Amino acid sequence: MATSVKKLLAGLSGEVFKVPPVWMMRQAGRHLPEYLETRARSKDFLDFCYTPSLASEATLQPIRRYGMDGAILFADILLILDAMGLKVAFEKGEGPLVEQINGPSDLARVSPQKAADRLSPVYETVSRVKAALPAQTTLIGFAGSPWTVSLYAIEGRGKTDKSTAWRWAHGRPDDLAAVMDLVAEATAEYLARQVEAGAEALMLFDSWAEGLPDNIFREVVIAPTRKLVALLRERGITVPIIGFPRGAGVMLPEYVRETGVTAVGLDTAASPAFINAELAKGFPVQGHLDPLLLIEGGARLDARVRELLDAYRGRPHIFNLGHGVRPETPIAHVERVLELIRNA
């Protein structure tokens, strides 16, 4: 089959490769010594994300080291809440802390209209990265999906059992929908501006999709994602959109059918047999090596990489992880995975 300069972009458009395109979630991060050096130049994590010279450098580091086919913008899914007017902080040992929304009256202090303008440093980061990337590398913009971002605002923190947001889904669906609508509106403009700045594909992270009852999954994951995708298309955004409903399980085929995403990210628990049986052969999939196995390395890592390559041979497949690269991951193990893929 004909090749393309931008292999990842071609894969998202349905092209099949003997050697699939590859990148890794959280490829720019604490497993890289150069990242730690760059991170030390900022006063805190938000400052790091909002400083284009630093965020662009972090985005480019794994491209220089590994030659990944995709460069994903270095940012955080909670920037949108910060820009909308909810105070966000990242405390060591606590994870993210967010100014909590307790009810409809709190929405008065949230401004989706102003959020996109406040995120202008992110668009500058995108432009800087685009100008510096090799011609064959696809630039991926991203945001959190409405459910996951709203959950942080409702819970007020990242370390949570999610019960408050789940109770809203069951008992206060109209209030939850109001929050998610505001998030979707702000996120659509945010992502559209990323594309205008140079992003060639987009990814929607629904990190808290796991474990939801099927009816609630439809209401808080599928419906808001469908709305967000529609808002982007209405704005004339035509780039591929990768949906990543982590932990969707048996709801994944319905998510693919109903949301309008171009491709789907698979989590660590996904079964290749299930994916190949339930998703159309021409639908692009991305994933899904276990990041903990990437830490361990050895013969089992080699075997799993080959197993995933074989399982998705003949369909559009972007090799990735089922979750992000962890800080303790040896660089040599990442290099080994890339060697196996590139010699497939």
Swiss-Prot record:
GO cellular component terms, alphabetically, are: cytosol
Q: Keyword Cytoplasm: yes or no?
A: yes
Q: Per the record's keyword annotation, is Cytoplasm included, yes or no?
A: yes
- Annotated residues that bind substrate are located at 26-30, 76, 152, 207, 323
Classify the source by domain of life: Bacteria
What's a Pfam family in this record?
A: URO-D
Q: Cellular location of this protein? A: Cytoplasm
Q: Name one GO biological process term.
A: protoporphyrinogen IX biosynthetic process from glutamate
What EC numbers are recorded for this enzyme?
4.1.1.37
* Known pathway: Porphyrin-containing compound metabolism; protoporphyrin-IX biosynthesis; coproporphyrinogen-III from 5-aminolevulinate: step 4/4
> Catalysed reaction(s)?
uroporphyrinogen III + 4 H(+) = coproporphyrinogen III + 4 CO2
Which terms in the Gene Ontology molecular function aspect does this entry carry? uroporphyrinogen decarboxylase activity
Q: For this UniProt record, give its keywords in alphabetical order, as a comma-separated list.
A: Cytoplasm, Decarboxylase, Lyase, Porphyrin biosynthesis
Site for Transition state stabilizer, residues: 76
Functional description taken from the UniProt entry: Catalyzes the decarboxylation of four acetate groups of uroporphyrinogen-III to yield coproporphyrinogen-III.
Subunit and partners: Homodimer.
Q: Which family does the UniProt entry place this protein in?
A: Belongs to the uroporphyrinogen decarboxylase family.
**HAMAP family on file:** URO_D
Put simply, this protein is called: Uroporphyrinogen decarboxylase
Organism listed in the record: Hyphomonas neptunium (strain ATCC 15444)
